[in-house]
């Protein structure tokens, strides 16, 4: 087994948007839309900050996390003119 700890896509995604302070829209399973910046997360919850207020959102209530800008986690970014 590798000494390197493998990460799941959820952790890689959330850590990327946290580090880059990417604004996100989070849709809950009941249809509620939350917007803000992810400041922290663990296996069960996400902290979302907006306008100086922090919300604790349980992951089991989240349907979708949508960043405000496109992100590229595992693929090289595509340049504006179509070149790689």
UniProtKB/Swiss-Prot annotation:
- What is a biological process (GO) this protein takes part in? regulation of translation, ncRNA-mediated
Gene Ontology CC terms, in alphabetical order: cytosol
Q: Does the keyword RNA-binding apply?
A: yes
Which residues are in the Sm domain? 11-71
- Task of the protein: RNA chaperone that binds small regulatory RNA (sRNAs) and mRNAs to facilitate mRNA translational regulation in response to envelope stress, environmental stress and changes in metabolite concentrations. Also binds with high specificity to tRNAs.
What protein is this chain from? RNA-binding protein Hfq
Q: What are the entry keywords?
A: RNA-binding, Stress response
Q: Which organism is it from?
A: Paramagnetospirillum magneticum (strain ATCC 700264 / AMB-1) (Magnetospirillum magneticum)
Q: Which family does it belong to?
A: Belongs to the Hfq family.
- Gene encoding it? hfq
Which Pfam family, any one of them, does this sequence belong to? Hfq
Q: Which PROSITE patterns match?
A: SM
Q: Which residues form a coiled coil?
A: none
What would be an example GO MF term here? RNA binding
Quaternary structure, from the entry: Homohexamer.
Q: Does the keyword Nucleus apply?
A: no
